């Protein structure tokens, strides 16, 4: 939330250059405040677990957030009851005519399937296209980030020979972006995927900015230069046990997965996992919600022309 300061205070210019959110007394006196409306398209198999993870992050800010849950179709989910889906999820036709401050599209266990072969690929494309006119800022996670980069910019991923699973060190590659406020020079983030994007092509694209990357895991946070789309290649929302649960699930299915890197104590899957990314995940979502949703979105959501992108 902003710090209200006197008009013309000398510190204002310094604070603003550091991406500290300050507001003059004059602006504060005329400020309209309302809850942020965020839509979540949940593509993960365990809907309730993913809902909990994302709501935990959204709830860790001082902003009031009104959340709608969206499903891709009305078919039964393998890991979630149809009653839960019918009671708490909306179909796209129910939100098509609405506008939202933010949209989160989750990952999906589709890493080895070509995009065009995904059963609901046309629905995904339709929702991505819709979001560009009806949502102030979109946060794409993991598979959704790859899918959106492919659909919006024609940048395809490359399949990996083995699943990239683990917790990896990342570094900032850009400065002076509000999204990176409070980030350490190096931080941890979890990954769980079968593909990766070509970081050189991402850096060369005139409409994209790579903000953070990992020597092992590649590009991590990529931002559209209009600040409307944020692509995160990992899973900052994961709880402590998620990589462990995925590892043992794959073992039970006879897939012979590799042990997630830098995750279990002493890299021993019989020992407890160590969560090193929770503070980063919380900061990432908080900064996105504050700087790229709350500060950019119009007060009247019926008029999306009121969006004012950050200058960078």
From Swiss-Prot:
Annotated site (Important for acyl-CoA specificity): 111
Sample GO molecular function, one term: homoserine O-acetyltransferase activity
SUPFAM superfamilies in the cross-refs: Class I glutamine amidotransferase-like
Pfam families xref list: HTS
Keyword match Manganese: no
Compartments it resides in: Cytoplasm
EC number: 2.3.1.46
Protein residues bound to substrate: 163, 192, 249
Pathway info: Amino-acid biosynthesis; L-methionine biosynthesis via de novo pathway; O-succinyl-L-homoserine from L-homoserine: step 1/1
BP GO terms, sorted: L-methionine biosynthetic process from homoserine via O-succinyl-L-homoserine and cystathionine
PANTHER family per UniProt: HOMOSERINE O-SUCCINYLTRANSFERASE
Family as reported in the entry's similarity comment: Belongs to the MetA family.
This protein's name: Homoserine O-succinyltransferase
Organism: Shewanella halifaxensis (strain HAW-EB4)
